[in-house]
A protein has these predicted regions:
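Preference for intrinsically disordered or flexible, low-complexity segments
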Residues: 4-184
Length: 184
């Protein structure tokens, strides 16, 4: 492993290196290379590797080797767990990109990956009420949909690391911000 190797970019998780990796020297369980970045987010698989590097996540090797997912297929907005429901309108390749080649994010409850413009959004990170002030009009409908009577209260009490966390997304097509509220 060449330490000067370019880190892979995760277009659906642009802040992955701050949020989902830690600087730990070790050997990747998947590729066997000495690495300095270890994934510390969710990975749903039978066998739990101790050390996954960003390269094995980005090229799909980690998901394939361990038959795992970083985000569950049905946790992507627009995908129904019910086989009787119509199939998702989002392209299968984009759904696989989220499940198999994009780092997940840690949450209290099962993580949810929001969509917009017929594609998965980019996860920007965790947001508190102050982070959301400039984009309140954009994200209020998402909160109101889940908490019709308490939307303003919820928005006022969101924090980056408390019991009510805002998970902020942005559409890669139109730039619209979306918000999922994760409850501890």
């Amino acid at each position: 492993g060449d330490p000067r190797m370019e880190r892979p970019l995760f277009i659906h998780h642009p802040n992955a290196y701050t949020l989902s990796f830690e600087e730990v020297v070790g050997v990747c369980d998947c590729c066997g290379q000495p690495r300095a970045l270890r994934y510390r987010g969710p990975f749903y698989s039978v066998l739990s590797p101790d050390y996954l590097c960003p390269w094995c996540i980005a090229d799909g090797r980690a998901a394939a080797s361990y038959e795992g997912e970083f985000t569950g297929w049905c946790d992507i907005e627009g995908v129904s767990p019910d086989p009787a429901d119509p199939p998702p309108t989002i392209a299968r390749e984009l759904l696989l990109e989220i499940c198999e080649r994009t780092p997940g994010y840690s949450s209290w409850q099962q993580s949810v990956w929001l969509s917009h413009c017929e594609r998965p959004c980019a996860f920007l990170g965790f947001a508190g009420n102050e982070d959301l002030l400039p984009i309140l009009d954009q994200v209020r409908p998402d909160v109101a949909a889940v908490n019709p009577r308490d939307a303003d209260w919820v928005l006022a009490h969101l924090s980056r690391d408390g019991m009510m966390v805002g998970c902020l997304f942005q559409c890669l097509e139109c730039g619209q911000h979306r918000l999922h509220v994760d409850l501890g």
